[in-house]
């Protein structure tokens, strides 16, 4: 019989790592909620049309990377490759903009059929924030500050904020024709993929990871030279606000966003510690998306953080595992019933309790208590049952006379006091 394994690019999150994820998620939620941002949860499966309309037919995501299939009703469905389009759809479908501007956060798995590599699997996880109905430069700066403060509060080092402006759709239309004319002079350097992008989405070539193309685009025309005065003024205002907030940044005129719905502000937070996959957080403004998906005109801006890349950067700085406060050692029919009752009572008092269910000798159960890193072991056996007692042992204390305590089973207040010390 064939051994069943995960699909390539789909990775199990094991208990030895899940506690780190929980701590990151908890800190993210704290940062978002103190900024008045509320959670939204959307399905991982959507109609394919949502992404083809929202992200753009000409993008690599839609053209090459989506997990799409026809369901039994004949509908084309797709596992979400990103979160923004789904959140925008939910905002439209549920009429949330009728209640005023929306400040929302989301998290969960996304799916793209890419070559798996460190920090990016085919199933990957993002946590992100979206503002709908907010158009000011101040809202751009506020969103950037929320992302920046969250990542710095995690203790990450060597972070750099890069910003750019993509201007208006008219700015990009003028620039697009200039860029195409320039790139058409170098067909032998572009390769098949970039030649295809040249026809569909030439700005994506600026984001190429190919070293030869990166050298080529160093001399390409700049979008910043094709902006109208209003776009220039807006970008200068953003820089002034970021300086006021004392958030360090650099302008990267080659920075583009990979999806079609972006305009004006684009930003990335990168770390040299990640090598080629340097981006930890990416975001920008997308004022036309809601209308493009059938909703009212609604300015919007958002960002997403890649959890896998974030955990690579954090390394071992967050504890990997949650250790029990109490390991309940028990043997014998009456003792097992008493141990289960005590475990429940202690858990209801917010102690982390692991109950041994092996029926093994006490020595083996003590080894297990030590292995899981328990602070205390509580022993209930026939002797303790007959005396109406429980025996407590503080683990990892060398002096045996100081690490064992006998306590009456009925003395719950004293037990709690001891466990809290």
Curated annotation (Swiss-Prot):
Q: Which GO terms describe its molecular function?
A: ATP binding; histidine-tRNA ligase activity
GO CC annotations? cytoplasm
Localization (cell) = Cytoplasm
Does this UniProt record's set of keywords contain Ligase?
yes
Q: What is its EC number?
A: 6.1.1.21
Q: List the disulfide bonds in this chain.
A: none
- What are the recorded Gene Ontology BP terms? histidyl-tRNA aminoacylation
Show the coiled coil region(s): none
The family database entries (CDD domains) matched by this protein are listed as: HisRS-like_core (cd00773)
Concerning PROSITE patterns, the annotation shows: AA_TRNA_LIGASE_II (PS50862)
Q: Which reaction does it catalyse?
A: tRNA(His) + L-histidine + ATP = L-histidyl-tRNA(His) + AMP + diphosphate + H(+)
**Mind listing the UniProt keywords for this protein, alphabetically?**
Aminoacyl-tRNA synthetase, ATP-binding, Cytoplasm, Ligase, Nucleotide-binding, Protein biosynthesis
Q: Which residues form the signal peptide?
A: none
Q: How does it assemble?
A: Homodimer.
Q: Give the record's family classification.
A: Belongs to the class-II aminoacyl-tRNA synthetase family.
PANTHER family in the cross-refs? HISTIDINE--TRNA LIGASE, MITOCHONDRIAL-RELATED (PTHR43707:SF1), HISTIDYL-TRNA SYNTHETASE (PTHR43707)
Q: What is this protein called?
A: Histidine--tRNA ligase
């Amino acid at each position: 019989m064939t051994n069943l394994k995960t699909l390539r690019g789909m990775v199990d999150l094991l208990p030895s790592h899940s506690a780190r994820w929980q701590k990151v998620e908890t800190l993210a939620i704290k940062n978002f909620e103190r900024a008045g941002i509320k959670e939204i949860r959307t399905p991982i499966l959507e109609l394919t049309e949502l992404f083809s309309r929202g992200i753009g037919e000409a993008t690599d995501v839609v053209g090459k990377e989506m997990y799409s299939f026809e369901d039994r009703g004949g509908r084309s469905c797709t596992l979400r490759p990103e979160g923004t389009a789904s959140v925008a759809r939910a905002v439209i479908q549920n009429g949330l903009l009728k209640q005023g501007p929306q400040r929302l956060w989301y998290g969960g798995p996304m799916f793209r059929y890419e070559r798996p590599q460190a920090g990016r699997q085919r199933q990957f996880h993002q946590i992100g924030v979206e503002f709908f109905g907010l158009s000011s430069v101040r809202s751009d700066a506020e969103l950037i500050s929320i992302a920046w403060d969250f990542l710095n509060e995690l203790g990450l080092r060597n972070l750099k904020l890069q910003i750019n402006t993509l201007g208006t759709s008219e700015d990009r239309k003028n620039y697009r024709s200039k860029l195409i004319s320039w790139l058409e002079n170098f067909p032998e350097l572009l390769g098949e993929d970039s030649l295809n992008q040249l026809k569909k989405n030439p700005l994506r070539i600026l984001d190429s990871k190919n070293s030869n193309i990166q050298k080529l685009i160093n001399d390409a025309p700049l979008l910043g030279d094709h902006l109208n005065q209003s776009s220039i003024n807006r970008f200068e205002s953003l820089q002034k606000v970021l300086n006021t907030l004392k958030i360090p940044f650099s302008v990267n005129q080659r920075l583009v966003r990979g999806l079609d719905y972006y305009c004006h502000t684009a930003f990335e937070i990168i770390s040299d510690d990640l090598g080629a996959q340097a981006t930890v957080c990416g975001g920008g403004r997308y004022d036309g998306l809601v209308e493009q998906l059938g909703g009212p005109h609604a300015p919007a801006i958002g960002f997403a953080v890649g959890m896998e890349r974030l955990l690579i950067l954090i390394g071992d700085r967050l504890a990997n595992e949650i250790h029990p406060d109490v390991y309940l050692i028990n043997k014998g029919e009456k003792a097992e019933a008493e141990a289960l009752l005590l475990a429940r009572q202690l858990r209801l008092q917010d102690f982390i309790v692991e109950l041994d269910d092996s029926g093994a000798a006490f020595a083996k159960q003590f080894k297990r208590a030590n292995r899981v890193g328990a602070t205390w072991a509580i022993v209930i056996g026939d002797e303790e049952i007959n005396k109406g007692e429980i025996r407590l042992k503080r683990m990892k204390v060398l002096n045996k006379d100081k690490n064992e305590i006998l306590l009456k089973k009925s003395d719950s207040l004293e037990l709690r006091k001891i466990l809290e010390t």
